[in-house]
Amino acid sequence: ENTQDSPELPQVSKISVSYNEKNFLFNPEEIDYVEANDGKVFVYVKREQYTGAFRMGELEEKLARFGFFRCHRSYIVNMQKVVELVKWTRNSYSLRLSGYEKTDVPLSKGKIQELRSMYEF
Protein backbone atom coordinates (compact mmCIF):
# COMPACT_ATOMS: atom_id res chain seq x y z
CA GLU A 1 0.00 0.00 0.00
CA ASN A 2 1.30 3.42 -0.93
CA THR A 3 1.34 5.67 2.13
CA GLN A 4 3.23 8.55 0.53
CA ASP A 5 1.35 11.80 0.51
CA SER A 6 0.09 12.79 -2.90
CA PRO A 7 1.67 15.98 -4.23
CA GLU A 8 -0.33 19.01 -3.25
CA LEU A 9 -2.61 20.31 -5.93
CA PRO A 10 -1.83 23.83 -7.12
CA GLN A 11 -4.00 26.54 -5.61
CA VAL A 12 -6.63 27.58 -8.11
CA SER A 13 -6.80 31.33 -7.95
CA LYS A 14 -9.35 32.18 -10.65
CA ILE A 15 -12.45 34.07 -9.57
CA SER A 16 -15.72 32.96 -11.16
CA VAL A 17 -18.32 35.55 -12.12
CA SER A 18 -21.38 35.68 -14.35
CA TYR A 19 -22.76 38.08 -16.93
CA ASN A 20 -25.88 37.61 -19.08
CA GLU A 21 -26.28 34.07 -17.74
CA LYS A 22 -22.75 33.15 -18.89
CA ASN A 23 -19.97 32.23 -16.48
CA PHE A 24 -16.45 33.63 -16.71
CA LEU A 25 -13.21 32.96 -14.86
CA PHE A 26 -10.80 35.83 -14.24
CA ASN A 27 -7.29 35.88 -12.89
CA PRO A 28 -7.20 38.10 -9.78
CA GLU A 29 -4.80 40.59 -11.42
CA GLU A 30 -7.39 41.25 -14.18
CA ILE A 31 -9.93 42.47 -11.61
CA ASP A 32 -10.03 46.24 -11.05
CA TYR A 33 -12.31 46.38 -8.03
CA VAL A 34 -15.21 44.69 -6.28
CA GLU A 35 -18.34 46.42 -5.00
CA ALA A 36 -21.11 45.17 -2.74
CA ASN A 37 -24.42 46.84 -3.44
CA ASP A 38 -27.96 45.92 -2.45
CA GLY A 39 -27.00 42.42 -1.31
CA LYS A 40 -25.11 41.62 -4.51
CA VAL A 41 -21.38 41.54 -5.22
CA PHE A 42 -20.16 43.10 -8.47
CA VAL A 43 -16.73 42.48 -9.95
CA TYR A 44 -15.34 45.09 -12.36
CA VAL A 45 -12.95 44.08 -15.13
CA LYS A 46 -12.01 46.59 -17.87
CA ARG A 47 -15.05 48.74 -17.02
CA GLU A 48 -17.43 45.77 -17.41
CA GLN A 49 -19.60 44.78 -14.46
CA TYR A 50 -19.98 41.10 -13.59
CA THR A 51 -21.95 39.46 -10.79
CA GLY A 52 -20.17 37.28 -8.28
CA ALA A 53 -21.78 34.61 -6.11
CA PHE A 54 -19.73 35.11 -2.94
CA ARG A 55 -19.56 37.25 0.16
CA MET A 56 -17.20 40.20 0.47
CA GLY A 57 -15.37 38.57 3.39
CA GLU A 58 -14.48 35.44 1.46
CA LEU A 59 -13.48 37.45 -1.59
CA GLU A 60 -11.32 39.74 0.54
CA GLU A 61 -9.56 36.66 1.90
CA LYS A 62 -9.03 35.17 -1.57
CA LEU A 63 -7.74 38.39 -3.10
CA ALA A 64 -5.54 39.74 -0.28
CA ARG A 65 -2.42 37.90 -1.45
CA PHE A 66 -2.83 39.42 -4.92
CA GLY A 67 -2.48 43.01 -3.69
CA PHE A 68 -6.13 43.79 -3.06
CA PHE A 69 -7.21 46.08 -0.22
CA ARG A 70 -10.59 46.28 1.52
CA CYS A 71 -10.82 50.07 1.50
CA HIS A 72 -14.47 50.23 2.63
CA ARG A 73 -17.06 47.74 3.84
CA SER A 74 -18.55 47.77 0.33
CA TYR A 75 -15.34 47.90 -1.73
CA ILE A 76 -12.19 45.87 -2.39
CA VAL A 77 -9.67 47.41 -4.79
CA ASN A 78 -6.73 46.09 -6.76
CA MET A 79 -4.00 48.42 -5.47
CA GLN A 80 -2.07 47.99 -8.74
CA LYS A 81 -4.91 49.87 -10.47
CA VAL A 82 -5.07 52.81 -8.04
CA VAL A 83 -3.62 55.96 -9.61
CA GLU A 84 -4.78 58.71 -7.27
CA LEU A 85 -5.80 59.36 -3.70
CA VAL A 86 -8.50 62.03 -3.88
CA LYS A 87 -8.93 64.22 -0.80
CA TRP A 88 -12.48 65.45 -0.17
CA THR A 89 -12.20 66.95 3.30
CA ARG A 90 -9.55 66.86 6.01
CA ASN A 91 -10.30 63.22 6.88
CA SER A 92 -12.21 62.05 3.83
CA TYR A 93 -10.58 60.37 0.85
CA SER A 94 -11.46 58.24 -2.11
CA LEU A 95 -9.38 56.21 -4.55
CA ARG A 96 -9.30 56.73 -8.29
CA LEU A 97 -8.48 53.77 -10.48
CA SER A 98 -6.86 53.61 -13.89
CA GLY A 99 -9.58 53.51 -16.55
CA TYR A 100 -12.27 54.70 -14.11
CA GLU A 101 -11.71 58.46 -14.16
CA LYS A 102 -15.36 59.17 -13.33
CA THR A 103 -15.57 56.62 -10.50
CA ASP A 104 -14.27 57.39 -7.04
CA VAL A 105 -14.04 54.42 -4.72
CA PRO A 106 -14.60 55.51 -1.10
CA LEU A 107 -11.91 55.01 1.50
CA SER A 108 -13.29 54.43 5.02
CA LYS A 109 -11.96 56.68 7.76
CA GLY A 110 -10.78 53.58 9.62
CA LYS A 111 -8.79 52.40 6.59
CA ILE A 112 -6.88 55.64 5.97
CA GLN A 113 -4.26 54.84 8.62
CA GLU A 114 -3.78 51.33 7.27
CA LEU A 115 -3.24 52.69 3.76
CA ARG A 116 -0.92 55.41 5.06
CA SER A 117 1.32 52.85 6.73
CA MET A 118 1.38 50.73 3.56
CA TYR A 119 2.27 53.59 1.22
CA GLU A 120 3.83 56.19 3.52
CA PHE A 121 1.88 59.31 2.55
Model-identified regions with their sequence ranges:
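Conserved binding/recognition cores within well-folded domains
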Residues: 1-106
